[in-house]
Structure formats: C-alpha cells, structure tokens
Amino acid sequence: MEELLSKQREECKELQSKITNLRKQLKEGNKKQKRALQQKISQMEADLSQKHATERQKLDKGDEETNETQQEDLLNTLLQQMEDTKITTAEKSSVQSSLNTKENTPQQPKKSRNRQKERLERRKAEMKKMSEQAELESEKMADLKNEEKKKFSKILEEAGLVAVDIPADGNCLFASISHQLNYHHNVKLNSQALRNKSADYVLKHCEQFEGFLLDEESGEVLPVSDYCNEIRNNSKWGSDIEIQALANSLEVPVHVYNTEGPVLKFNPSTVKFEKPLCIAYYQHLFGLGAHYNSLLYRDN
C-alpha cells in the first residue's frame, strides 16, 4: 500500500504541474477554446481520481488474502537468510529471540509479536480508510451521473428534443454529427470521413488553433501535424475544436446542449445548410469521460 500511495502522490504532482501549464493557456484564446481547455483539465482530474480509486480497491482485495501469512513468511525468510550466511549459533539465537521464539526469553518474542501486530492493524485501518474513500468517490460519480440525467431531462423537455443514443466508442462526436447530417440534410458522411474533414480544416487554418491542440495523456500542446494525425488515425475524442472545424467545413451551424450553461452555438463563416445540427454533451454519463448524443425534435 505504501508503494502505491507513493506512486499516486507522484502522479498527482505530475498532473498538477500539467494543469498549471494548461491554466496559463486559459488567459489566451477565445471563449470556446478556453472552454475546451477547461473541459480537458476536468477530464484529466476525473480520470486520475477514478484510476487511483480502482488501484486502491484492487490492492485492498489482494492484501486481505496475503496479510494472514505475512508473519510466518517473514520468520521463515529471516531464518533462511541466517542459514545461507552461516551466522553463529549465538547470533541465530539472538535473531530468533527477536522473532517471537518462545523457547528463549519469552518476554522479548511477545514484544516483537505485538509490534508486528500493531503494524498490521495500522495497515488494515489505512486500507479500510482508502477503501471507504474509493466507495465515496464511486458514489459521488453515481450522484453526478443521476444529477446530470435529471438536468438534461428538463432541458430537453423544454426544448422539445429527445436524445438518440450513440455508442461510446471514441467516435461519439463524429457519429452524432453524422446522424444529424443524414437525418436533416441527407448528407451521408461516416465518422472517419468527418475525422478527415476536421483534420483537414485544422491543418489549413492552424493559426486559429495553435496552442489549444492537446495530447490526451500528457495534456501537453501538440504540433498541429501531430494532432491532426491523431484525429485521422486514432480514436481520439472530438472536442470543441473539431465541432468548430466541422461547422466551418460543412457550412452548417452546430448547437451543443449541456447542463452547465446555455446552448453553445458554433456558427460557420458561410452557411450552406440553415437547419442546425443539434447534439448533447455529457460529462458524467459514462465513467470513461465526456460523451455526445444526437438530438431530434419530438415532432419530427
């Protein structure tokens, strides 16, 4: 457990360092680009918290199975080491006395055994505390998910919209826009085609996006060419950057409904299709992170 906690503390320090660098970038750029950075920061924090909770739960289960044999294993290991190094009988007797040997000086073994028991009890208490913390974090995630569902239900009811479920496979943004294009404008473009379109636009208008193209794992700013390559060839999640790129390249408005504020409207510089594409942005629907669904009007 000590080793895991040390590793997790280091990971937290690394994350805070990355977040500090990202927050410096929040002072620049437009409102939508700032929102994309803030979403990325929140997602990085949530992902690390969930990762740590899972690691602690796994270690907790493993330690419960091994604690019962720790004392016996420790005794056997030390005695074997004494045989291997051929220490004297007097030295061996001294070590055995400190390791709960009832035959020699009964008071000393009792004291050593009690100290070991206390260490185990402290460790169990710490593990229990960490397990309870993991459960609280899990309950918190469930509460956030339920609260988001309630808010979205009210928002969509008032707007006369209904959500169309899109698979959470890393392509949800592109799949949602693909569904909207086909439904409203009879334009058939799959997720890969939309990935290519957004990457082409970002690459062509790189001056609009430089400094806001982030690596999902490190949170560091990527060169435009590297970022576009990830959008094309990997299941990199789409964000506000891709939404704006697609709105401009497809010449269609995109409206993003969310529970944190008003509808975000991504308007293209020139309009070919007047009817906007409507999608929903979820932060807590899935434990994996952000998710998008397609939205349709009930009277359609």
UniProtKB/Swiss-Prot annotation:
Region (Disordered): 23-73, 89-141
Alphabetic keyword roster: Cytoplasm, Hydrolase, Protease, Thiol protease, Ubl conjugation pathway
InterPro entries found in the cross-reference section: OTU2-like_OTU (IPR049771), OTU_dom (IPR003323), Papain-like_cys_pep_sf (IPR038765), Peptidase_C85-like (IPR050704)
Keyword Transmembrane helix: no
CDD domains in UniProt: OTU_fungi_OTU2-like (cd22762)
Superkingdom of the source species: Eukaryota
Annotated Basic and acidic residues bias: 48-61, 115-141
Annotated Polar residues bias: 89-109
Catalyses which reaction(s): Thiol-dependent hydrolysis of ester, thioester, amide, peptide and isopeptide bonds formed by the C-terminal Gly of ubiquitin (a 76-residue protein attached to proteins as an intracellular targeting signal)
The keyword Kinase is annotated on this UniProt entry: no
Role according to the record: Hydrolase that can remove conjugated ubiquitin from proteins and may therefore play an important regulatory role at the level of protein turnover by preventing degradation.
Chief localisation class: cytoplasm
Occurrences of domain OTU (ranges): 161-298
Enzyme class, broadest EC rank: hydrolase
Entry's EC annotation: 3.4.19.12
Record's protein name: Ubiquitin thioesterase otu2
